[in-house]
Design a protein with these regions (language model features):
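A structural signal for short, hydrophobic/glycine-enriched beta-strand patches
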Residues: 1-175
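C-terminal capping/extension of enzyme domains
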Residues: 163-197
């Protein structure tokens, strides 16, 4: 029973799809370069014509707190998560004209809301989309993007940036705290969504 319950948690939390050709690649805001690097690789391999990184900074910090990994590669002065993610994309071969701009979001739900505003303003019909996000963040990010794009088929392409993934989360207290914290946020935030509808 215990092992089965753990497996159910892992299947719910850790989403990884085989990407298909899409209309856009979404990258929710963060200070890690890996998600934008993966988005750039997918772009270079012809999976989508546009990438939409999204983010100002975390609402809890009130400012962009800086690059969290590979600082030797990405050492610019970034005011927003979008500035940082754009630089990562361009350093990894994505032309500026393929990068859409959303630099106001301060949390995941806003990433989805403001991304929808951008794609609507650009008259983009998003039938299929790839979502590049942190491994632990995949379920919550997908929940919000799916809410704002209910008719879009999503493919999650996640990155393990903090050594917490489907195979390792249960091995450390940090991993357990991260996954259980995400589950708690999903439950709380989804309950608020249900009450609004």
């Amino acid at each position: 029973m215990y092992e089965e319950f753990l497996k159910q948690i892992e299947e719910f939390m850790f989403i990884e799809d085989k990407p298909e050709k899409a209309d856009v690649i979404f990258v929710p805001g963060n200070g890690y370069p890996q998600m934008a690097e993966k988005a750039a690789e997918l772009y270079r391999n012809g999976f989508a014509p546009k990438i939409l990184p999204s983010g100002r900074y975390s609402i809890t910090a009130g400012r962009f707190t800086g690059v969290l990994d590979k600082k030797e590669c990405y050492c610019g002065t970034y005011k927003t998560e979008w500035d940082f993610l754009k630089d990562v994309l361009m350093q990894n071969g994505v032309p500026e004209e393929a990068i859409l701009k959303e630099d106001q979001a301060t949390y995941t739900y806003e990433n989805a809301i403001y991304s929808r505003q951008v794609t609507d303003r650009e008259y983009l019909d998003i039938k299929k989309a790839i979502l590049c996000c942190k491994t632990c963040h995949a379920r919550r990010a997908l929940m919000y993007y799916k809410l704002l794009y209910p008719d879009t088929e999503f493919f999650v392409s996640s990155c393990c940036v903090d050594s917490i993934d489907k195979n390792t989360w249960i091995m450390t207290n940090d991993g357990i705290d991260e996954v259980m914290g995400e589950i708690t946020r999903i439950i709380k935030q989804f309950s608020l969504m249900l009450k609004k509808n």
